[in-house]
Amino acid sequence: MMQLRHGIFDESSISVIALDTVHEIGRLAGRSLDARRFRPNVVVRSLRSAPFQEDQWLGGVLSFGEADDAPAVTVTMRDIRCSMLNLDPDSATPAPEVMKAVVRANQNNAGIYGVVTRIGRLAVGQIVLLRAANEKRERG
């Protein structure tokens, strides 16, 4: 992860979505969805199986790894979706039922945006921890 002053992004420097959210939107739209359709920087597989759980992460900090100097993102806002998510990432075939499902299920929001608060390297399979913004990291 790195911090950019300028870049190509929608609202914030990092977008994150949970697989449970992708699967629920697919279920509601009546089709299997690829997470790439949502153009996230990070896809999270949560131990807590709940669609749209990212809404509860607002104001929190996602730490990528357990080290004290692990890369971190402060969650700043819900990801308001545009019609681009109707397009299949491989074929560009439109499926308007996808956007309709997001609107009906979660007020047109799917995933979150955040800002990088600690730079570092991310890896597939890495543990992601959520903590309150003012919570100190403690070793137990």
Model-predicted regions and their roles:
Residues 1-140:
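Metal-cofactor-dependent catalytic cores
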